[in-house]
């Protein structure tokens, strides 16, 4: 049995208190607690506490400490239940305490995976223009349940997906101006897959791109690559030269007809 002999406010934190006790051998430092724990257990000078009571006080102090760590972590941005659990594990908090902290955070509505998923979907679709497949994978990695994700993705209709995909295409296609139209389409297709768009949405967007095909730019790309390969293969004669040129340009996405026209032009120049 111990008796509390003195309670003093810590100099560096007005919300924490040092508790001094006497176990029969004079006053000594016992432990420190948060103000919440001080009030919860009614700690005051003269109070007698046994080992069981002390154990409960110290356990609740650890819970409060972990709770405040979680609150601080949440102050930067919203987090999922799993993210909070992982954060506390890295702080070497025990599982029993983690469970209590998460339960309290859920009760106080500091964490709510449904609200998090909706906000995350809106942000990733509107700001980063990610497709639903990537958003779903990222939410799963954050521990959000599949049913909650399905509900949150209703915030991201197909029309918005198409709008975002077309914006991404418009930005990216400028960097493919020296590619053939076919090769540009393939690269844009790959980009949209990486971004998380469905095959259906990609097909619709690339069909719209077909209507914008620029013959002049296609010819510029053909001449750019054709002249590069011409310099590379001009040391060859006849069939070998033409075969290497055709294979190289075909791999770049140009049609046989386009390649033949280019080679005919080179024959006439020569």
Swiss-Prot record:
A Pfam family annotated for this UniProt entry: RecX_HTH1
Gene Ontology CC annotations of this record: cytoplasm
Source organism superkingdom: Bacteria
Cell compartment(s), UniProt: Cytoplasm
Keyword Cytoplasm: yes
InterPro entries found in the cross-reference section: RecX_HTH_1st, RecX_HTH_2nd, RecX_HTH_3rd, Regulatory_RecX, WH-like_DNA-bd_sf
A biological-process GO annotation: regulation of DNA repair
Broad class of the protein's primary localization: cytoplasm
Entry function: Modulates RecA activity.
Family the entry assigns: Belongs to the RecX family.
Protein name per UniProt: Regulatory protein RecX
The gene coding this protein: recX
